[in-house]
Amino acid sequence: MTRGPGERPELADAGPAVLVAVEDRIATVTLNRPRARNALSRAVMHGLWDAVAAAGDDPGVAAVILTGADPAFCAGIDLKEVAGDAPPAVPPRDPGLGPGRDTNGLFRFLPVIGKPVIGAVNGVAVTGGLEVALQCTFLVASQRARFADTHARLGVMPGGGITVLMAQSMGLRRAIELSLTGNFLTADEALRLGLVNHVVPHEELLPFTRRLAGDIAGNDQDAVRRLLQHYRQVASAATLDEAHLIEGYLAETWRPGMTQVAGRRAAVTARGRAQASDAD
C-alpha cells in the first residue's frame, strides 16, 4: 500500500512523497524524496503526518517504522521551498490538522499516537531531520547514519524539540556542543552518547528494526499503550513543557531574512557533506 501527495514535476522523485507499507501489523513509513535527500517540503510533512496518524488509527497496526529512501534519512526543512525559490506543491492546512506547533510550544512533525514509532535512520539526519528522528520513540541507526544540528550555521532557531529532546537523550553539555558547533556525529558516536539504541550494518537496518517492532507487536497492546503513556508523562514534566515553550518562543520570534538563510544553504550543505564523507 502506498499513499501520499505528489510533488512538483521538476523536483519530484518517482512515486509519492511518502510511502506506506503495512505487513505483519507493522507500518513502514518511508520519506521518498531521495534526490532531495528527503528534505521536508510541505508535501513530505503532510504525507508523513497523515501516514503516522493513519497507522495510529489502524487497529491492524501495532508499531510504526519511520525511515528514508537512500541515501539520506532526512536533510531537514526544504530551504528552497521556505525561501520561495520553489512554491509548495500542496496548500497549507488549518491548525491541528497537520504538522505544527503544539500547545506546549513544540513543533510536531509527528502526531502523538498510542503506538511506538521506531526511527530507522539510514543516512544523514540533519537539523529538521534530526528533530523528526528525536520525535520517534527510539532510534536504530545504520552504520551510514550521520547526525547534525546546523541551526546555528544557518542562523535560525530550532522549534522541533532539539534543545529538549537531544539533551534528554545524550546529556545537556553534549547537546550544547552539537548545536553550537554544527558538527556531525557518526552512528557509533551517537550510540555511545545514547542518541540511538542500536547501530547495525546498513543492509540489516530494516530487518533488525522489523524484528524489534515484531517483538512489540507480540506483546499485550493495552500494556504497550499504557507504558508509552507513562513514559511520556515522565518526559513531559512541567519543567520540560516550559523548555518547549521557551524553544517555541525563540523560534517564533527569531526572524532572519529568508534570502539570508537561502544564501547560506550551499555553504552549509558543502560543509556538511565534507564532514559526513570524512566520517566514512
Q: Where are the regions that the model predicts?
A:
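Hydrophobic/aromatic residues within transmembrane alpha-helices
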Residues: 29, 66, 78, 132-133, ...
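Short, active-site-adjacent cap segments at secondary-structure transitions
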Residues: 71-75, 126, 231-234
